[in-house]
């Protein structure tokens, strides 16, 4: 999100949050915090807890719910968001028909629900650039499943079958990248508040990750690759 908001190549019309690595309330709070701290006038709308057709909460792993990361931003109430993410997507796409690109870095629940609200949505969206899936490598939840698709496969099927042009950044690409301690330390040396936020956010993942390879070699990049591809 910070990469997108700091990129002059993009005009961000809005951000929607979805239940993925963290609960929907945490995602809403994190996104709202970033928008406010950057001084941007960008609406943030929250999706509903759960998935497109059923609630898979018991099967999910909250990869981001670590004590260190929970302390970075307060949990904000989502009750004031009367419109909600699906309606915002449907209305904004119609108002800007043909000029809209969606960049997704989580499950596709909000878009699937937006398709239900407006069956003509595919005619309004230019394309979707998404971090999702795996082609020639194993998944990161099961041998066959990448997390963003696994977390809500029904919504993924709905979106992939919608006819909207899709550019996918799969695990095959993500696993060719690394962001490790050396890069994080360079960012942490900068006193800018957002450099400090990145340092505090990523440090727990490198410090207490059960995967020794990640501690030694660094994290793979995922969502930022989809944002970067949207420049093109």
Predicted regions and their residues:
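N-terminal acidic, glycine/proline-rich low-complexity segments
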Residues: 1-232
